[in-house]
Amino acid sequence: MSIELLATQGRTRVHGGLASVEATRLRQMRNSALRCCFARMEETRHRMEHVAHIHGIEFINDAASGSVNATWYTIENTSGAIIWIALGDDNNTDYSRLRPLALRKVRMLICVGNDNTNLHSSFSGVIPNIIDVKTIADAVQAACYSGIDQAKVLFSPATPSLRSAQTLGQVFSHQVNEL
């Protein structure tokens, strides 16, 4: 199949096709190999993980998204109005790929960090509400009281962090559960 023909199939059909190929490969594996494969899946926590539904707002932990591409995928696959919590303090990340998607789906951007200049310059005029906070706890509070009904609060850093995704994800989940 040519790349041109594949491109006309659409993203959903391509993903479905790839899933079918993987399903066929999985059927050919032995049970013990499958158990081992699925046992390792627990290690992929904090990737599009539902945390809680509070006052009509769903909180989603995507702390494992340490790149623009991973965050793009998550935003693309999240329906409804999005309140995006992103990490600042990284002035080297190129967010340009996220701009068209953010324009369509993100209603509020909460920037966590001491220097959020890059996030502001990348999304000013694209996302209607952009605020700065210092901690993930403050970000969760701001999202909860944003006034955006039926929103999905998405914690997706979009940039590498000195702290591990595991630590960031645990902090986010803990703060949500403290609401």
Language-model segments: residues:
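ATP-dependent carboxylate-amine ligase
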Residues: 3-12, 19-30, 36-179
